[in-house]
Amino acid sequence: MSKVYDWFEERLEIQAIAEDVSSKYVPPHVNIFYCLGGITLTCFLIQFATGFAMTFYYKPTVAEAYSSVQFIMNQVNFGWLIRSIHRWSASMMVLMMILHVFRVYLTGGFKRPRELTWVTGVVMAVITVTFGVTGYSLPWDQVGYWAVKIVSGVPEAIPVVGSAMVELLRGGQSVGQATLTRFYSLHTFVLPWLIAVFMLLHFLMIRKQGISGPL
């Protein structure tokens, strides 16, 4: 076993990385409220795992979306549990994200030199809300359908480009299969990659600059 470890140690310098992580200074004023960002990340990882599991059974078509969700809930082993965890962790992620934003703002964590850390955090907050909007539509029940219709119609109030934005979101003049396909693509591919990039930037900057001091 030691030979295997030595082989990886020689190439990856695992010990140096471990020492760097374990020796990072943590300010004495840090309390439980500074864990809200980590809890948000944990919720996202749960979302990723449970969402990935459901993609094996979910069918993103207007004819089969609702029935596939019912199949997950009633026929798939522990499907009801996986979807319930996905649903409740989504709500928890939004709540923890809001509390995290408030904590950072109230403790001045957005001030120089951490402006870019704050910006990436705000971008991730917007992405998180977008996750909720797109995911809400995927069961394609009455609530999901009308939610999509209302949300996708909001940009129409924007001068000049409003109508074009609505058509882009819906994939046509009305809500239908193209709309569901777009929302499914956003929810399962575009947004996860996007938030992963901003998370990496966010964590690298926190790692570089450290936790902000007390007010």
UniProtKB/Swiss-Prot annotation:
InterPro entries: Cyt_b/b6_N, Cyt_B6_PetB, Cytb/b6-like_sf, Cytochrome_b_N_euk/bac, Di-haem_cyt_TM
MF term (GO), any: electron transporter, transferring electrons within cytochrome b6/f complex of photosystem II activity
Organism expressing this protein natively: Synechococcus elongatus (strain ATCC 33912 / PCC 7942 / FACHB-805)
Subunit structure and binding partners: The 4 large subunits of the cytochrome b6-f complex are cytochrome b6, subunit IV (17 kDa polypeptide, PetD), cytochrome f and the Rieske protein, while the 4 small subunits are PetG, PetL, PetM and PetN. The complex functions as a dimer.
Family: Belongs to the cytochrome b family. PetB subfamily.
Single biological process term from Gene Ontology: photosynthesis
Amino acids binding heme c: 35
Other facts: Heme 1 (or BH or b566) is high-potential and absorbs at about 566 nm, and heme 2 (or BL or b562) is low-potential and absorbs at about 562 nm.
UniProt cross-references to SUPFAM superfamilies, sorted A to Z: Transmembrane di-heme cytochromes (SSF81342)
A GO CC annotation given for this chain: plasma membrane-derived thylakoid membrane
The protein's required cofactors: heme b; heme c
Cofactor note: Binds 2 heme b groups non-covalently with two histidine residues as axial ligands.
Protein's UniProt name: Cytochrome b6
CDD domains referenced in this protein's UniProt entry, alphabetically: Cytochrome_b_N (cd00284)
Residues engaged in binding heme b 2: 86, 187
Cross-referenced NCBIfam families: PRK03735.1 (NF002990)
